[in-house]
Each structure stands twice: as structure tokens, then as C-alpha cells.
Design a protein with these regions (language model features):
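Glycine/threonine-rich phosphate-binding loop and adjacent beta-strand/alpha-helix elements that clamp
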Residues: 202-229, 239, 244
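Long, contiguous, secondary-structure-rich segments that constitute the structural scaffold
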Residues: 224-279, 351-367, 371-462
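Conserved short loop/turn motifs at secondary-structure junctions
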Residues: 36-40, 63-70, 102, 155-159
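Glycine-rich phosphate/diphosphate-binding loops that line cofactor/substrate pockets in enzymes
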Residues: 25, 46-59, 137-149
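A glycine-rich phosphate-binding loop feature that marks nucleotide/adenosyl-phosphate handling sites
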Residues: 16, 51-52, 95-106, 255-270, ...
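Extended redox/cofactor-interaction regions of prokaryotic respiratory oxidoreductases
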Residues: 81-190, 200-210, 218, 278-376
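Flexible glycine/proline-enriched surface loops and loop-helix/loop-strand junctions
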Residues: 29-32, 61-66, 219-228
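Long, well-ordered, tryptophan-enriched scaffold segments
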Residues: 1-55
Length: 462
């Protein structure tokens, strides 16, 4: 973009800072320089950039897979930089932002929400009072002041969803006490001393606070429960509030605040001044209009400007450059790079317990390019052994020409064959967990986030 004078900030020109700094920072990453590591010819990279710049509207877009690897933060930053530099941010046809009826974004008095404190064992940075999940097992297993001795989980399954799941499994066994708010006895909740099953599904009301913020149009929709909850059942919000009440040591009578009260207040004080009753009178929701340009008003920087080149991220570019040089040397012991995938019908582990969603051909396979498979003398659907630094699993190989040579791929959320799991449907499709191969020591060094992709592995026929 810089080489072809393609910078077109458009309406963002007056409040975007750091363009020249950005130009200098990426000068070493020319199409010719990155062609080998990306596997994309320099001419093709140039064509993509030219097409992007020439398009009337365009969006560069990345989601979970981009985020959960060793340079996730850097990648998401550069995606935004590309959209901003080409005039595709806060403009029709480009990346735009919602004006939700229930606002969850606020200007903070203290904008510093990163690395205010660190994890006890490895010193990983916090973000918004949360620690990277890669630190979870070690914080339970490592003795000393501040060791985690008790745990509450809520509708989560870290044994299958965090790196080095076997270590996580072992860590949960060492807890003094564990409570799970869940409707399933799964790979994680089987360790709990107490399981508190909340009312769920069609027994609950719903207002999607998160996805109204991420929508392609401004809308608001409330869904009341279709059925009353069963006798003596509690909603999850009742359980959370009562637990918090008791943790505080309060003994007075306690009456939980229903989410409808919070929602109604937020709607009435929001930009549209609607209320919950209006939503209840509109069962299909209320259309609040198309997305509109909202910069600089919607920016949360203190000076209401886009800071294109923060120093923290510029420094991480140097790490990327060093990694790029090092990655040219292939590992002899672990020559293949493992990445993850999610299928539309089973993208989370709990969906495997639905017969309608899990039915069909086996999706827990190792995707591998046929040329790599032939080198390893692996037939299509042959069982293979995959080994990383932390573990070994066995599963069928599936030839796939969409895979890049040297890269293999496994799905998320399987591994239901562990003892005492009470998921009748899922156990019939147990598969193996990709997170028994992922490594809690592999991180996005900038944030400490787990790197679930680009895990180096060895593959052999069984």
C-alpha cells in the first residue's frame, strides 16, 4: 500500500496519527521478503493489494483463528491498520460500528487495562482483570502464596478448551474444592464437588448484549422464556448473585436483581430511550436503522484520535521479524505445523451431545495434504499417531488438497472418552482432543494469550 501510494484515509484523515511511523515500521516486510514464509508469490501479494486498493469498498477481516496464534495481537492490529489506511474504516462498505440500544462500551477514566499486574508463576500480563488461560493449570499446581485452591466454572470445559488439556485435567484433581454451574457432567465438571444445574434453553429469557454490538445493522430484540423453569430450579443469574452474597459473608435476606431490570434501565438511559415493554410488544425485534459513520465521537482514546502505531505493537513487529528469520529452519523432530478448525455444526464441545448436530461422517480427522501423506506412506482414512512436546493422540488422516504442504489440521472440542463423562451421544463420537497436543508454553508473547495454532508435531502411521 505504501509502495504504491495507496494511502487514502478519507474522512479519518483529520484524526489519524502515526501514518509515517507505520510506513517506516513495515518497510522490511515487502512482498518479495515475505513470499517464502507465506507461500504466496510476491506478484500475487501485489495483485491482492492492488485489487484491495482499487475496490470501491473492501474489508480485511480476521477472527478467532487469526487471534489464537503466536502473533494474534499483531495480526489483528495490522488488519485494522490496512482497513484504516485504505479508507475502509468507518465508511459505508467498509468496517463500520454499531450504535446499540444497550450500550456496553464506556469511556474509562483510567484507560490502562493491560498488564497492571501479572500471574504468580510466569508473570503473564492481565487484561481487564483476566489472566491468560495458558496460566490456569500452573496456578493450581504450583504451591505457595496465592495458589489457586478452589474454582468455579460456568458452562465451560477447560479440559477440552485450554492448551495441554491433560495437564489441566490433572490440575483440577488437585483442587480442594470445585463448583460447576452446568447442565452436563463433562470432561471438566466430573471433577466438581458440587454441580449446580441452572434453568436453561427455552426456560430462559434472552437479550443478546454482545451480538447487538457486533451486528451489521442496529437492532434490539428481547425473547421471553417459552416455558416456565422447573420447580425449585434457579436461573444462572440467581445462582451467581446468591453465591456472591454468601461470599461476602452477608446474612440478611437477599433478593437477586433480575437481568430484565438491568436491561430495562440500560435501554431507557440509552441513545434510543426505548424500554423493555416496547421490545416485549415487538417479538421480532425493533429495527433501529443502518450503521452510520461515528468517528471520532465513538473513539475511546483520550484525544479522540486513531493512534495507528502504538509503541507496544511496534516493538512486537521486531519479534515477528526475528521469528520470520528463524522459521526458515525446519524442525527435524517436529516437522509439521498443526492448526485448528471448527465445523459449523460442532464448533463447541457441548454441541457434540446433540444427535442432530453430530450425525453424519466422522469429522474428528487430521487433514493433511496428499503429497505429505504419500511421503509419510499414509493412506486416506488411515489411523495416524500425532505427537507434540506435550502429548500424543491417534486419529484418522484425511487427505485434503486445501491444506498447505507442511501443515495439518484437527478440529476443536473432541476427546469425550475420558472416565466418568456422562454425555451419552458425545461419547459415541468421542474422538480425540487437539488440546492434548497444544502447548501451554506457546504464547502470543505480547499478551500471554495461548497460541493454539502453529504447534509443531510429528506424524507417523500406526
Amino acid at each position: 500500500v505504501f509502495a504504491e501510494n495507496g494511502v487514502q484515509l478519507g474522512n479519518n484523515n483529520a484524526f489519524t496519527e502515526g501514518v509515517d511511523t507505520m510506513k517506516a515500521a513495515v518497510s522490511d516486510f515487502s512482498p518479495e521478503a515475505v513470499a517464502e514464509i507465506t507461500g504466496i508469490a510476491a506478484s500475487e501479494i501485489q495483485r491482492l493489494a492492488q485489487d484491495f486498493m482499487a475496490a470501491k469498498t473492501a474489508i480485511c477481516y480476521g477472527r478467532v483463528g487469526v487471534s489464537t496464534q503466536g502473533f494474534g495481537t499483531l495480526s489483528q492490529w495490522l488488519i485494522n491498520v490496512l482497513n484504516i489506511l485504505t479508507g475502509n474504516c468507518d465508511s459505508v462498505g467498509g468496517v463500520m460500528f454499531t450504535a446499540p440500544a444497550f450500550e456496553i462500551l464506556r469511556q474509562r477514566k483510567d484507560p490502562n487495562i493491560f498488564n497492571r499486574w501479572q500471574s504468580r508463576v510466569r508473570g503473564l500480563p492481565e487484561f481487564m482483570s483476566e489472566l491468560p488461560v495458558a496460566a490456569m493449570a500452573e496456578e493450581i499446581l504450583t504451591e505457595g502464596q496465592g495458589q489457586i485452591r478452589a474454582l468455579i466454572t460456568s458452562c465451560g470445559n477447560p479440559v477440552l478448551s485450554v492448551p495441554n488439556g491433560q495437564k489441566m485435567d490433572a490440575a483440577l484433581e488437585k483442587l480442594d474444592f470445585m463448583v460447576s454451574i452446568d447442565i452436563y457432567i463433562n470432561e471438566t465438571t466430573r471433577h466438581a464437588n458440587i454441580i449446580l444445574p441452572p434453568a436453561t434453553g427455552l426456560e430462559t429469557s434472552h437479550y443478546d448484549i454482545t451480538f447487538h454490538v457486533l451486528a451489521i445493522r442496529n437492532t434490539a430484540k428481547y425473547s421471553p422464556p417459552l416455558f416456565p423453569k422447573s420447580e425449585n430450579a434457579k436461573y444462572d443469574w440467581e445462582i451467581f448473585q446468591e453465591l456472591a452474597h454468601h461470599f461476602k459473608g452477608e446474612t440478611a435476606d437477599f433478593k437477586p436483581v433480575p437481568p430484565e431490570a438491568i436491561l430495562n434501565h440500560g435501554l431507557k438511559t440509552g441513545r434510543y430511550s426505548i424500554d423493555l415493554q416496547q421490545l416485549m410488544n415487538a417479538p421480532h425485534g425493533i429495527d433501529l436503522g443502518a450503521l452510520e459513520s461515528c468517528f471520532p465521537a465513538r473513539l475511546f482514546t483520550a484525544d479522540k484520535k486513531i493512534q495507528l502505531a502504538p509503541e507496544l505493537l511496534l516493538q512486537d513487529l521486531k519479534r515477528a521479524h526475528a521469528f520470520w528469520q528463524q522459521s526458515k529452519q525446519q524442525s527435524i523432530d517436529f516437522p509439521y505445523a498443526l492448526i485448528g478448525r471448527r465445523h459449523l455444526r460442532d464448533n463447541n464441545s457441548w454441541l457434540h451431545n446433540s444427535e442432530r448436530l453430530i450425525k453424519g461422517r466422522n469429522r474428528c480427522t487430521l487433514l493433511i495434504h496428499p503429497v505429505d501423506a504419500n511421503v509419510l506412506k499414509i493412506d486416506n482414512q488411515q489411523v495416524v499417531k500425532v505427537t507434540s512436546r506435550v502429548g500424543t493422540v491417534e486419529l484418522p488422516a484425511e487427505w485434503c488438497t486445501d491444506m498447505m504442504r507442511g501443515v495439518v489440521c484437527m478440529p476443536h472440542g473432541y476427546g469425550h472418552g475420558r472416565a466418568n463423562v456422562q454425555l451419552d451421544v458425545a461419547r459415541k463420537h468421542a474422538g480425540v482432543s487437539v488440546n492434548d497436543l497444544t502447548d501451554e508454553q506457546l504464547l502470543d508473547d505480547l499478551t500471554g494469550n495461548a497460541a493454539f495454532s502453529n504447534v509443531l508435531v510429528h506424524i507417523a502411521a500406526v
